Amino acid sequence: MKVILANPRGLCAGVNMAIDVVDQLLDICTDEKICVYHEIVHNRHVVSRFVDRGVTFVESIAEVPDGAIVVFSAHGVSPAIRQEARDRNLTAVDATCPLVTKVHAEAIRYSKRGWQILLVGHADHQEVIGTRGEAPDAIQVVESPEDIPHLRIEDPAKLVYLTQTTLSTDDANVIIDALKEAFPEIKAPPGGDICYATTNRQKAVRALAPACDLVLVVGSRNSSNSVRLTEISENVGTAARLIDDLSEIEDHWFDDVKKLLVTAGASAPDDLVNDLVIHLVERFGGEVEQWDVDHETVEFGLPGSLKTVMRDRGIDPSGRRIVIDQSAELHEILDSRGIPHTTVDLTIGASG
């Protein structure tokens, strides 16, 4: 069986930043209680590993003990949550993905100008809850084209749509096209809102899945972008399974599978993918090929609130960046085990 690794896959820069924020707080605030508001990212393994290191995850600021540090997750929070933390004089560290922050800024800007905002996304997703909280009187959530007849529009000439960053581009475009048909004057967000990592991982599956017999997506079931990857594979005609880790696979899945595509959601740690690939090759034989559909060269700076915590404790944060390079580690592991592997370059450039 040939195991094909989709590239890009797995951790994005925003998730890496959020995980790094908690890692660094654990290293420098050894005698302080660290809480995270909501799951830092939507991955069971990431959360459980932090719990094992003493982090407490909460669903309300009231659960945070006095004097503790509270971290806002990668999905972002509403102004009301930030104010609640300030009212309690908690040390708050913001690990919101910068691309989510961009959507928040757009919501604030358009609402201040008196525009109505149609937010395309899942109403119960933490990111949408946080964005909606920036301008609750101006924002209406649109989950499907069926919601459009029920929208309350005052002036179609002052109407803009924004989107949840982790949506399937296919699903989002269906809703956006329906909005444009219903409201021809509706304005699009500058540069689009669906993040580069979501787009690239979906593009890779859309391009590679038709050449494969089965797709395995590593990710948790509450990860929106991971679920979307399985749906995209199925939409192009290739069966797909979403797994948290290799413990969930069953041997009969691979009967008659000659080409297996492996990818991962943007919140799935690299070691889960690495362990899966090694297990598959050692169990079923074969070789590994990485098929590069895009090259991501993305890095984020540390959040300002984390820099403040570091400086307050005598640590200089200068020059620190969050950089992604997931392929090198896996190639080294495969080499060390003598597993044949090659890279196929299908790219037409770099993105992100």
Model-derived regions: residue spans:
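The feature marks the mature, well-folded catalytic cores of soluble enzymes
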Residues: M1-A264, D270-L330
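Generic N-terminal targeting/processing segments that precede catalytic cores or assembly contacts
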Residues: A328-G352
